[in-house]
C-alpha cells in the first residue's frame, strides 16, 4: 500500500475557490475519513486524487511519485461511488470481472480474482444475479468487489452508503471496516455522516468551506475540538451552545445563572459554553442552569430532553428514566471538564 501526500492542493472554478491550499499526509494502510457538510469540498478533493478532476494548484504525490498529470488508470487507484455504477445487463460476476477483462487479462486469472473478491465480500450466492435482482447492500458489495479485483494501492470511497437505509448503513460500515482490516489497504473515505466517520476512521479530517478545520483520531476530535465548528459537527446528538460571559472561573448566562468552569478560563470575556448532551446532569435545586423542557423522548435506557437554557435550544441525554412534562423547569449542570468554552467572535477555544 502507498502513502498519499497533498501539498498545497487548491481547486478553483473561475474566481471561485472551492479548495484552499490543502496540506494532508495519508499514511500507508491508513483508513482516513474526510467529513464535512455538503459543499465543503471533500468529494472534489477525492476526485482530484482519483484523477477525475484537474488540480488547480499544489502537488499530489502517490507513493513518492508526483501524480498531478497522471491519467486515472495509471494511478493504481480504485474508486467506489455512491451510485454503485453497475452495468445493468451484466451479472454480478461480469461486473466484478469487467476491469480485468478490458485490460486483457487471462480468463483464468480474472475468474480467480472474482472468486477471491466474492469470498471476501460473501457474494458467491449472488454472482449470477443481475443488479436489478440484488438489494442495495448487495449492489454496493459488488461495486466494492470490482474495486478489489483491481488490486489498487489506494481505495477511494465517495459517500458509498448514502443510498442505503439506516439499518443497512450500520451493517455496511462494519463490512467496509472489516475489509480494510483484512486487506491492510490505504483508504480515503468521504462522508457527510459524522457517525460513519467516528466509527470507521483511524483519523478524521473535518472540512468546511474548502479548508481543513482539524485532523486527528476520532476521540481526539470529540474531546478536544479545535473550534466551535468542529465541536458542533462531531458528535451525535450534537453539542449545545449557550452564550454568556466567562469571569473568575465561572460561566454566566445573560440571565445571571452561572456554573463553574476550568481555572484556565479565567478573565472576563464574551464566550459560548459548549456542552454535549450526555454531559448534562441534574443539579440541586437553585444551582446550575435552568433547563425549560419542551419535548421528552424516552428511549428505554435513556431519556432525551429538548428544551432551552437562557433562551437557547439545547438537548440533554440522561442515562435514566426521568418523568418530566413540557414546561417544567429542571436545574442542570455539567462537570467543568465537560464544558467547552469558545471565544464569541473567533469560535476558537479559550
Curated annotation (Swiss-Prot):
GO MF term set: ABC-type transporter activity; ATP binding; ATP hydrolysis activity
Pfam families: ABC_tran (PF00005), TOBE_2 (PF08402)
SUPFAM superfamilies: MOP-like, P-loop containing nucleoside triphosphate hydrolases
Binding site for ATP: 36-43
GO biological process: carbohydrate transport
InterPro entries: AAA+_ATPase (IPR003593), ABC_transporter-like_ATP-bd (IPR003439), ABC_transporter-like_CS (IPR017871), ABC_transpr_MalK-like (IPR015855), ABC_transpr_MalK/UgpC-like (IPR047641), Mo/tungstate-bd_C_term_dom (IPR008995), NA-bd_OB-fold (IPR012340), P-loop_NTPase (IPR027417)
GO CC annotations, alphabetized: ATP-binding cassette (ABC) transporter complex, substrate-binding subunit-containing
EC supergroup of this enzyme: translocase
SMART domains associated with the record: AAA
Location in the cell: Cell inner membrane
Membrane-protein topology: Peripheral membrane protein
Alphabetically ordered keywords of this record: ATP-binding, Cell inner membrane, Cell membrane, Membrane, Nucleotide-binding, Translocase, Transport
EC identifiers of the protein: 7.-.-.-
Source organism, top-level taxon: Bacteria
Coiled-coil annotated spans: none
Domain ABC transporter: 4-234
UniProt xrefs under NCBIfam families: PRK11650.1 (NF008653)
Family membership noted in the UniProt record: Belongs to the ABC transporter superfamily.
Assembly: The complex is composed of two ATP-binding proteins (BAB2_0493), two transmembrane proteins (BAB2_0490) and a solute-binding protein (BAB2_0491).
Function comment: Probably part of an ABC transporter complex. Probably responsible for energy coupling to the transport system.
PANTHER family for this protein: BLL2173 PROTEIN, MALTODEXTRIN IMPORT ATP-BINDING PROTEIN MSMX
Protein name, UniProt field: Putative ATP-binding protein BAB2_0493
Lineage: Bacteria, Pseudomonadati, Pseudomonadota, Alphaproteobacteria, Hyphomicrobiales
Amino acid at each position: 500500500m502507498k502513502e498519499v501526500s497533498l501539498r498545497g492542493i487548491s481547486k478553483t472554478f473561475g474566481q471561485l475557490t472551492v479548495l484552499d491550499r490543502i496540506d494532508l499526509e495519508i499514511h500507508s494502510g491508513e483508513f482516513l475519513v474526510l467529513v464535512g457538510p455538503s459543499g465543503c469540498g471533500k468529494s472534489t478533493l477525492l476526485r482530484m486524487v482519483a484523477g477525475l478532476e484537474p488540480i488547480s494548484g499544489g502537488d499530489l504525490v502517490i507513493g513518492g511519485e508526483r501524480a498531478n498529470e497522471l491519467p486515472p488508470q495509471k494511478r493504481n487507484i480504485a474508486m467506489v461511488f455512491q451510485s454503485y455504477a453497475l452495468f445493468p445487463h451484466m451479472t454480478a460476476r461480469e461486473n466484478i470481472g469487467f476491469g480485468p477483462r478490458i485490460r486483457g487479462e487471462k480468463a483464468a486469472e480474472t475468474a480467480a480474482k472474482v472468486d477471491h473478491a466474492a469470498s471476501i465480500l460473501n457474494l458467491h450466492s449472488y454472482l449470477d444475479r443481475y443488479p436489478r435482482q440484488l438489494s442495495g447492500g448487495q449492489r454496493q458489495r459488488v461495486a466494492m468487489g470490482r474495486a478489489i479485483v483491481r488490486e489498487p494501492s489506494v481505495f477511494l470511497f465517495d459517500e458509498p452508503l448514502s443510498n442505503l437505509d439506516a439499518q443497512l448503513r450500520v451493517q455496511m460500515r462494519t463490512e467496509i471496516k472489516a475489509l480494510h482490516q483484512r486487506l491492510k489497504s490505504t483508504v480515503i473515505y468521504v462522508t457527510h455522516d459524522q457517525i460513519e466517520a467516528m466509527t470507521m476512521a483511524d483519523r478524521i479530517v473535518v472540512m468546511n468551506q474548502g479548508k481543513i478545520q482539524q485532523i486527528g483520531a476520532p476521540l481526539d476530535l470529540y474531546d478536544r475540538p479545535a473550534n466551535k465548528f468542529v465541536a458542533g459537527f462531531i458528535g451525535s446528538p450534537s453539542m449545545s451552545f449557550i452564550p454568556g460571559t466567562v469571569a473568575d472561573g465561572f460561566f454566566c448566562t445573560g440571565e445571571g445563572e452561572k456554573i463553574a468552569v476550568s481555572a484556565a478560563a479565567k478573565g472576563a470575556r464574551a464566550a459560548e459554553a459548549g456542552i454535549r448532551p450526555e454531559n448534562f446532569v441534574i443539579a440541586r435545586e437553585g444551582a446550575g442552569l435552568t433547563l425549560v423542557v419542551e419535548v421528552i423522548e424516552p428511549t428505554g435506557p435513556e431519556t432525551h430532553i429538548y428544551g432551552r437554557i437562557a433562551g437557547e435550544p439545547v438537548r440533554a441525554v440522561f442515562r435514566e428514566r426521568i418523568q418530566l412534562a413540557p414546561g417544567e423547569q429542571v436545574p442542570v449542570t455539567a462537570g467543568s471538564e465537560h464544558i467547552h468554552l469558545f471565544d464569541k467572535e473567533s469560535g476558537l477555544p479559550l
